[in-house]
Design a protein with these regions (language model features):
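Alpha-helical transmembrane segments of multi-pass integral membrane proteins
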Residues: 37-57, 113-117, 138-203, 212-221
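Membrane-proximal linker segments that couple transmembrane helices to downstream signaling/catalytic modules
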Residues: 228-339, 351-354, 361-373
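N-terminal low-complexity or simple alpha-helical regulatory segments
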Residues: 1-121, 138-142
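Key DNA-contact positions within bacterial/archaeal DNA-binding proteins
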Residues: 295, 345-346
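Hydrophobic alpha-helical transmembrane segments and immediately flanking/interface helices
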Residues: 73-92, 204-228
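Hydrophobic alpha-helical transmembrane segments
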Residues: 98, 126-131, 196-205
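Alpha-helical transmembrane segments and their membrane-interface junctions
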Residues: 62-75, 192-209
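Alpha-helical transmembrane segments and their immediate juxtamembrane interface regions
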Residues: 91-110, 216-241
Length: 373
């Protein structure tokens, strides 16, 4: 079996390189609305396509250097691998992070990463020279440290962007939106898994390299499908970021006590009308309805109820749901979830369990047993 895998590995990677080029082409040709909002999205998909092309290029460099023997190694291959892995890291990390934060790719960040890449590439390239052959391992280790520094930095900034986006969604949308960006976090870790496997595969046999190729193909297919699906939600989700940017520019302060006293009866009236049962709305929609602005309303909710906008709306809907479940024990949970404004039964069950400590079905059964006593 091992002999078969070694004999046909070149054919396998040739096919996979074509797959990566095909996926990159699909990304480049995929059309998005020609609006300012999608400018960052278009740049992100081009970066992602560039990363896929670099994976394909890495394969062709390996094919050109492969002698047919799995026990002989070209010492310059790891040098090129480090350089290409660094460029892949830039493409994938910049693409994924900027889909969360449109301002992520700044001139300052690009200048910094360019200097770091130049230094890493310099050590990787001089490690290939005959004059410094005796120092090849130390030089490669220095280059590898440069690669690791870049990856650790991007992991930190990506997680920062991810947490920021979740916080923005919680304070802008009435329904939970974090599931729309979960694929970005998964893709982020899948990519770093690919780099780790790529480094290990430099000095391993055919079996491990076959498995790595299947992993990388699966990762790229996952990213392609999800980035295309994400396009339909991108404009809606970016409203939260645009709103936050405008708020930071305006520098509006928290509402004064007198204004809070004016706003409180309006909020109370809105709650009594049960307008929160509407399926989907944003804090901007509610602010317009209450004749105020988003900044003041958000501050009011935090000070008055001690929670974010989406958590506050969810708590109101949960109380209404429990009332309906008590009055109509035979009702379907799915119908109750939709009637009180939740976008799906799984989301309703998740919020309910987090609040009550049990699922809605268990809660209804317990209520039923208590009523029979």
């Amino acid at each position: 079996m091992i002999h078969f895998l070694e004999q046909h590995f070149v054919e396998l990677v040739t096919i996979t390189s074509i797959i990566y080029l095909t996926l990159a082409t699909i990304l480049l040709l995929y059309q998005t609305p020609d609006t300012a909002v999608y400018k960052t999205f278009r740049r992100s998909k081009r970066l992602m396509a560039g990363g896929m092309m670099l994976i394909s290029l890495n394969i062709w460099i390996w094919i050109a250097s492969f002698t047919g023997s799995w026990t002989e190694y070209n010492n310059w291959v790891p040098c090129f691998d480090i350089i290409l892995f660094y460029l892949m890291g830039i493409c994938f990390s910049f693409s994924l992070s900027s889909l969360l934060d449109p301002h992520y790719i700044s001139r300052k960040r690009c200048r910094t990463i360019a200097v770091k890449f130049t230094m890493t590439a310099f050590f990787a390239l001089i490690a290939m020279t005959d004059a410094l052959k005796a120092y090849q391992i130390p030089l490669l280790l220095i280059a590898l440290i440069g690669l690791l520094e870049m990856l650790i930095g991007h992991i930190y900034y990506f997680n920062k962007c991810y947490l920021r986006s979740n916080a923005l969604f919680e304070n802008y949308f009435s329904n939970e939106k974090s599931h729309f960006i979960r694929w970005l976090k998964v893709s982020h870790w899948l990519f770093y898994g690919m780099l780790i496997l790529g480094v290990i595969s430099i000095r391993t046999g055919a079996l491990f390299n076959w498995l790595v190729q299947f992993y990388v193909v699966g990762m790229n297919l996952y990213i392609l499908v999800n980035i295309i699906n994400y396009a339909s939600e991108y404009e809606t989700l970016m409203k939260a970021d645009c709103d936050k940017t405008e708020e930071e520019k305006s520098g509006e302060a928290s509402p004064k006590k007198a204004y809070i006293e004016t706003l409180r009866p309006r909020v109370t009236e809105w709650i009594q009308e049960k307008s929160y049962l509407k399926d989907q709305f944003t804090i901007d929609d509610l602010a317009t309805r209450l004749y105020t602005n988003k900044t003041y309303l958000s501050s009011f909710i935090k000070e008055e109820f001690g929670m974010s906008f989406s958590s506050w709306i969810a708590s109101l809907r949960l109380e209404e749901a429990k009332k309906m479940m008590s009055e109509h024990p035979d009702a379907k949970l799915k119908d109750i979830a939709y009637n009180v404004g939740f976008s799906s039964l799984p989301y309703f069950s998740s919020v309910f369990a987090k609040s009550e400590g049990v699922t809605p079905s268990v809660w209804m059964k317990e209520r039923g047993r208590n009523a029979e006593r």
